[in-house]
């Protein structure tokens, strides 16, 4: 897989402090026109949240397209140069740099870009519908590669001064332009770090087309494995007493005596016990296919 030059728009640095891009998880439909933030990128992806919950497809697309065009006309966003860009994120104790690139969705369909978890089917369909309506990717898909097999030090390639830099919470985000040409790199495989539903949305648009999507590609050695919790509900017709027996088909299961000793393990809390699970060697080639969250 060769990284392609990103064909995208960049936010004007002087508007960074004024622009919002909230998650749909914290938005409701109880807005009046006066409460709508004028520089809110969610108006592109989900105009129905702010204007009317029951928009026709034509109304949805028109509102999204018109707002996007207004950002261009007002020079709040501008067309990027024909260069590669690097994205860097810094905290007090960690930093990592990734390559901003376009990739072909066919590489995901052919399993060259691999997920690390299964998705909610309904949410994947929702992302596909959004992309079909607005024809716009608001958030990149975050990938990583095994840098033990590729000699690529992204830290030495960017210019000293970022074209965009801002702080959000504990993190500083920077975008750098680079004169380096990364088109000769050939990734054998990439892995989805974040954006499983977004990439599935692209996959469902039209599998016959060479659809491109924007990604940020990080070296594996620089990525942090952060703790993440999920609450899993059993289907109504599933006998939960069989759960551990079913799980043992794929995993070695050990009970943890002390909760504090669970760092860097997959852990399940079930029926009052903390259980460490390790994937059996016979199933390592299956990847995420040994886990299925269903609908």
Q: Can you name each region flagged by the protein language model?
A:
Residues 1-295:
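Surface-exposed, charge/polar-rich loops and edge strands
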């Amino acid at each position: 897989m060769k990284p392609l030059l990103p064909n995208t728009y960049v936010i004007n640095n002087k508007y960074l402090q004024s622009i919002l891009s909230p998650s749909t998880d914290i938005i409701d439909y109880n807005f009046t026109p006066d409460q709508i933030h004028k520089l809110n990128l969610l108006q592109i992806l989900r105009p129905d949240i702010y204007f009317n919950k029951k928009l026709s497809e034509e109304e949805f697309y028109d509102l999204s397209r018109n707002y996007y065009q207004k950002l261009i006309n007002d020079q709040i966003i501008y067309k990027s140069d024909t260069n590669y860009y690097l994205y860097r994120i810094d905290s007090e104790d960690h930093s990592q740099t990734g390559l901003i690139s376009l990739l072909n969705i066919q590489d995901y369909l052919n399993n060259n870009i691999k997920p690390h978890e299964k998705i909610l089917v309904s949410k994947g369909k929702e992302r596909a519908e959004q992309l079909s309506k607005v024809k716009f990717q608001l958030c990149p898909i975050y990938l990583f590669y095994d840098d033990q097999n590729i000699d690529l030090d992204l830290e030495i390639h960017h210019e000293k001064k970022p074209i965009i830099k801002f702080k959000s919470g504990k993190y500083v985000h920077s975008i750098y332009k680079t004169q380096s040409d990364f088109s000769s790199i050939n990734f054998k495989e990439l892995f989805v770090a974040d954006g499983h539903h977004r990439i599935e949305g692209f996959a469902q648009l039209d599998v016959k087309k060479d659809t491109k999507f924007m990604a940020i590609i990080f070296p594996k050695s620089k990525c942090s494995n952060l703790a993440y919790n999920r609450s899993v509900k059993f289907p109504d017709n599933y006998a939960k007493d069989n759960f551990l027996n079913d799980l043992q088909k794929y995993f070695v299961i050990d009970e943890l005596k002390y909760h504090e000793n669970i760092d860097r393990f997959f852990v399940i809390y079930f029926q009052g016990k903390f259980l460490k699970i390790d994937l059996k060697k016979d199933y390592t080639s299956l990847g995420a296919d040994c886990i299925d969250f269903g609908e």
